[in-house]
Amino acid sequence: MKITDIRLLPLTGATADGGWDQGFDEQENLHTLVEVVSDEGVTGLGSVYTSSKLCEGALGILRPMALGESAIEPARVCEKLHQSTFWQGRGGAITHLISGIDIAMWDLFGKVTDQPVSRLLGGRYRESIKPYGSLLMTEPDVLRARLEDAVARGFRAIKMGWGPFGRVSRELDEEIVSTARETVGADVELMVDAGGSDRYWPHGYKWALTTSQMLCDYGITWFEEPLRPDDLAGYCKLTEHARLPITSCEVLTRRQAFQPWIEQRAVDYIQPDVTKVGGLSEEFRIAMHAYDHSILFVPHGWNTAVGLAADLQLVAAVPTARWVEYITPAPYIEDLVLGDPFALDDKGHLDIPIGPGLGLDWNPEGIERFSGMQLTPSDV
């Protein structure tokens, strides 16, 4: 079974609730679906956290290398793509697009073998997992309503990120956290994401350590991206001295970039993003390397239904996974699938799909509405 085509389906027309911090709007294309088509009529679907214009440029490089390759050997084929592009955007748009191709190939491989990706990765350690509802921070009064809605939807873990946190005053930071804890109560886990990968992040180690101490007073589960994303030394020091877990690494790509962060214990929890790190093949290797060093794997997932489906297969296959990220609400998640596969149970858990490939049935009307394109009919 050979690869005969790779198609890009750019998504526009929606954002996560609250919009984007960096000025993007509904007409911006930040997510691109990737479809891999085989000569036997079976297709797979992937997702990339990158604009279609960058993906188009990368596809011009990668397509000639991928066409004619086996459609059911994702790890080997995508390693070939990595190895063949050291001088062509390594770590950037090239790696991002390889992520989407890899996810799509695993989806296709699962369909051909009639197995979920998690089983093909080595086996399933769990059949469900706790999602944390991921939402943007804002002023306390508005935030309160968003939190109430997330709890009403069944979330028992919620992460608040970016917005004014760390950008106005320490007093406002604590008011936001205090309001959040008061709103959700003691039984809902709360995580805080400072968004240190934002433009011109102003804070360093001392701010992060002092803020982490304040967060401990409110029972915060972890403190995410309190420093700039390349501050390895700062993270090592902060992780050693903070009383709560420190998390980061969502902007890194390729397994090699994660090695010093894992081996130097720069974070307590590591957060690769499957839609840009290199796909399922690469992220699984990162997760298991972290596991060998007693660092918890928590996939970053500010993405689409396809990305969330890939994350669910990953957390099923990693021994110590405890959470998966779920943007809420998000049309690129709920509107791209048929049925209600992301419904939470009474414990606030998501079932991990057991069907072939990524395990979900895509909504062709939803995909066409946001991309203006149709999926290729698949024989499986």
Predicted regions and their residues:
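Conserved, mostly hydrophobic/aromatic
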Residues: I3, G41, L62, I101, ...
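Short Gly/Pro-enriched turn/cap motifs at secondary-structure boundaries
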Residues: Q22-Q27, A152
